[in-house]
């Protein structure tokens, strides 16, 4: 899982659209999942978009791996992912544990982040929210054709690298 996530991150950050975005940490999985911290190296960097794209890319990769493991009667868990700014990390962890469903992406970003991803993704609200965070949280509901095509290409590149490595 860790190797797959790192490879996905490396391949994704090569995309011209995400120029100026870099990872602060070297992500790894533990009993709580994995955390990737991204930063903007300049004012034009689309760090919120990079977070959403990485989350979706990981879901796409995990689905393939999960389905393959099930087919081979091996144990595998479906993934849940969340995208937030650093200030909302704890809130996102709570949301992932309370309202997130398998193979779903939750997004908890300030308005500037939501504006940045607005022309690339569609979101919906959490159904029947009971907390402030649940009201502020968005659920990924699809991406633009161009973004999804780009992610499919990156996914294929990661899978090709994985099978050769």
Q: Where is each model-derived feature located?
A:
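Residue-identity detector for threonine
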Residues: 2, 10, 37, 73, ...
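Catalytic NTP-binding/metal-coordinating core of nucleotidyl cyclase/transferase enzymes
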Residues: 1-50
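Conserved helix-loop functional segments at active or binding sites
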Residues: 14, 18, 60-68
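Intrinsically disordered, glycine/charged-rich C-terminal tails and inter-domain linkers
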Residues: 60, 87-88, 94-165
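A short glycine-enriched loop-to-beta-strand structural element that forms part of the catalytic core
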Residues: 21-39, 67-89, 106-109
């Amino acid at each position: 899982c860790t190797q797959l996530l790192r490879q996905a991150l490396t391949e994704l950050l090569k995309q011209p659209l995400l120029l100026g975005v870099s990872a602060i940490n070297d992500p790894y999985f533990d009993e709580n999942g994995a955390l990737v911290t991204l930063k903007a190296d300049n004012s034009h960097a689309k760090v919120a978009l990079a977070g959403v794209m990485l989350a979706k890319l990981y879901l796409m990769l995990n689905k393939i791996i999960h389905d393959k493991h099930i087919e081979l009667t091996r144990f595998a868990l479906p993934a849940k992912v969340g995208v937030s700014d650093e200030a909302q990390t704890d809130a996102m962890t709570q949301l992932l544990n309370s309202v997130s469903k398998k193979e779903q992406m939750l997004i908890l970003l300030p308005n500037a982040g939501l504006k940045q991803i607005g022309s690339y993704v569609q979101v919906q609200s959490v159904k029947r929210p009971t907390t402030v965070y649940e009201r502020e949280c968005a659920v990924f509901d699809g991406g633009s054709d161009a973004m999804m095509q780009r992610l499919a290409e990156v996914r294929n590149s990661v899978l090709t690298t994985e099978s050769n490595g």
